[in-house]
Amino acid sequence: MRVFTTGQLLGTVVAVQANFYKVQLDQEVREQGSRGAGEEVHLDSPLPLCPLSLLLCTRRTRLKKIGQQVMVGDRVVVEEPDWAGGRGAIADVLSRQTQLDRPPIANADQILLVFAVADPPLEPYQLSRFLVKAETTGLDVVLCLNKSDLVSPEIQQQISDRLLAWGYQPLFISVENQINIDQIAKYLSNKITVVAGPSGVGKSSLINALIPNINLRVGEVSGKLARGRHTTRHVELFELPNGGLLADTPGFNQPDVDCSPEELVHYFPEARERLAIASCRFNDCSHRDEPDCAVRGDWERYEHYLEFLADAIARQTQLYQQADPESTLKLKTKGKGQSQYEPKLESKKYRRTSRRTQVQGLQDLYQEEE
């Protein structure tokens, strides 16, 4: 059992701004009474009474020296609170249960993947890419489809049947008409949830509906590109009325699927289901053209798997080439995630000589003539 002393508080980092950390103190910490000075305090014992729920903190120099990073979502120990100024110092970071690098969030429990069924229209390839990226985190995935009021019930059923074949049960919502917002709130209760999805699908509007008076900036869909404009610039956790924290993340339209070629197949529920009832002949099967492959077959996202596999192989090859300075090819990423190899220019051969080097060369020449 972890032991704290009086003057130490427990909380969660909800925002990072430069070298400052906004820490939300635990509810039980804020509600329970104080103890005598110098007395040890256990996690199951009353902690000091806190006049404030949020403190703006810095990181102790000791943590900087040992390279301890502080992330949004981290459980931290805060000491020496200045209640008048609303300040404190982070003395320790508790062990993380989970960690995401992009976006940088610790201790997340699940991903709420938000897409729209219309305006912008639902793109199966883009959705598939987001789903695979979400699967790579190891977190539970909750898929919700916004703007359901813009399509008929028949279209909703077609979309639902299609996604069920992918291995996902979508929840149709409408922020505009407050459809199924209460049901979404039940999924988020007492958990740290990361909201993800492309720009323009209504992520910020959904958060505004779930957390009244938060007033997140909401953008419109670009008429020319039929894509949303970015309105979220950084990662921040917001407290839900019924408990739990919600992380709004910057929207993007084509997430990187940066897993290894060998791992990729396990991020498709359809492929996992096939591998659960049969095995491939070869242990290193890539599920492309090998004989007696259990994965290859007539399932809709198999073509997506092949495209993502080609990207993963190209990325792995690029890493090998970066480690090999003698390589004569380099991988260039073009539009829409397409990649191709190009000849690598000889190092420094085509670099213009600096004026300083030219002057030094002339000085050496004069010295030789003398």
Swiss-Prot record:
List the GO molecular function terms: GTP binding; GTPase activity; metal ion binding; rRNA binding
Please state the protein's primary subcellular location.
cytoplasm
> Please, one GO biological process term?
ribosomal small subunit biogenesis
Annotated GO CC locations:
cytoplasm
Q: Does the keyword Chloroplast apply?
A: no
Under the heading InterPro entries, the entry gives: G_CP_dom (IPR030378), NA-bd_OB-fold (IPR012340), P-loop_NTPase (IPR027417), Ribosome_biogen_GTPase_RsgA (IPR004881), RsgA_GTPase_dom (IPR010914)
Q: What cofactor does this chain's UniProt record say it requires?
A: Zn(2+)
Q: What does this protein do?
A: One of several proteins that assist in the late maturation steps of the functional core of the 30S ribosomal subunit. Helps release RbfA from mature subunits. May play a role in the assembly of ribosomal proteins into the subunit. Circularly permuted GTPase that catalyzes slow GTP hydrolysis, GTPase activity is stimulated by the 30S ribosomal subunit.
Subunit composition and interactions? Monomer. Associates with 30S ribosomal subunit, binds 16S rRNA.
Name of the protein described by the UniProt record? Small ribosomal subunit biogenesis GTPase RsgA 1
Species this protein is from: Nostoc sp. (strain PCC 7120 / SAG 25.82 / UTEX 2576)
**What high-level taxonomic lineage is stated for the organism?**
Bacteria, Bacillati, Cyanobacteriota, Cyanophyceae, Nostocales
